[in-house]
Each structure stands twice: as C-alpha cells, then as structure tokens.
C-alpha cells in the first residue's frame, strides 16, 4: 500500500530548511509564532516537533541590545562563509540587534552584547572578512576584536558602530 503525502506533510530536512530560512529573515519571538509562519507556508507542525527541530538546528533565543523580548537565531552553519558576499549585510543586522556598547584599548575594540550573544556576533565579524580585522575572541557577553595595523582599536570600534 502506497501512502501519498498531503501538502501539509514535509520531510524533516525540508521543514528544518524552512525554519532556518524563516529565522534568518524574520524576528521570531516564540515557537507559536514560528508554527504560524510555517502553517502560512502549508507546513503543519506540533509544538513537540518544532521544539525538537529547533534543538537539532542549534537555535537559541537571544535578547537584543534593547533588552526586550528575545528572538530565535540559528548558528552560522548555513550562512555565508568567510569572505563571501552577504556576510557584511548579516554583520550589520547582528550589530544593530546585539551591540550594547563599544570601547577600545590599543588595537582592540571591545564590544558588549546581551548575555549569550557574543559568539554569534564574533562569528559574524569573522565571516564578514573585513580587511581591517585580524580576528575575534568571544566570551559570554564580550567580544575582543583585533584591528589590523595601522588601524587603532578606537577607529575599529567606531567603524563597527557605524555598520549598525
């Protein structure tokens, strides 16, 4: 006996690909909001399945710099690799959402983020392949960004703030 799939039934991979696409393009604040967006595309999903999908994708809910309601984000795995176009656009978006403050010392820009968001911001900086950045180190809520000579840390902090 052959089972035919209805329009609301999708493979796990296809469903997860849509979840990544939605989370990359919209600020989703809850699982019910995500389920509604999927339903709009004809993908019906239970809360338990959605929760499992988010966990498998490594999605996390992060608060923005304004401290407001958190939004879901997925890791960089599907994002542009270092130096590929699109990395700077993503960096600008993340800076505007996550940058709380910027300071500097010598050749370092010190960026503050909400708790748990520093690694996402550091990864976006690395992947943007900015010619004036040597590299990053991220903690929980702080990113050290090393400026390439002759740029100073203060100039780098100012440049990154202007990308928001």
Swiss-Prot record:
One Pfam family here: Arg_repressor
Protein's GO biological process: L-arginine biosynthetic process; protein complex oligomerization; regulation of arginine biosynthetic process
UniProt KW keywords: Amino-acid biosynthesis, Arginine biosynthesis, Cytoplasm, DNA-binding, Repressor, Transcription, Transcription regulation
Family: Belongs to the ArgR family.
PANTHER family: ARGININE REPRESSOR (PTHR34471:SF1)
Role this protein plays: Regulates arginine biosynthesis genes.
Entry protein name: Arginine repressor
Species of the source: Mycolicibacterium paratuberculosis (strain ATCC BAA-968 / K-10)
């Amino acid at each position: 006996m052959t089972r035919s799939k209805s329009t609301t039934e999708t493979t796990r991979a296809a469903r997860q690909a849509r979840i990544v696409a939605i989370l990359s393009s919209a600020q989703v604040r809850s699982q019910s909001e995500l389920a509604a967006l999927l339903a709009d595309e004809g993908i019906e999903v239970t809360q338990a399945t959605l929760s499992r999908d988010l966990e498998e994708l490594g999605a996390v809910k992060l608060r923005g710099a304004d401290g407001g309601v958190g939004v879901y984000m997925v890791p960089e795995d599907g994002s542009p690799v270092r130096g590929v176009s699109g990395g700077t656009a993503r960096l600008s978006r993340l800076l505007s959402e996550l940058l709380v403050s910027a300071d500097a010392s010598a050749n370092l820009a010190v960026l503050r983020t909400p708790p748990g968001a520093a690694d996402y911001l550091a990864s976006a900086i690395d992947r943007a392949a900015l010619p004036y950045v040597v590299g990053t180190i991220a903690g929980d809520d702080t990113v050290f960004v090393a400026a390439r000579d002759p740029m100073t840390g203060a100039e780098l902090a100012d440049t990154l703030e202007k990308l928001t």
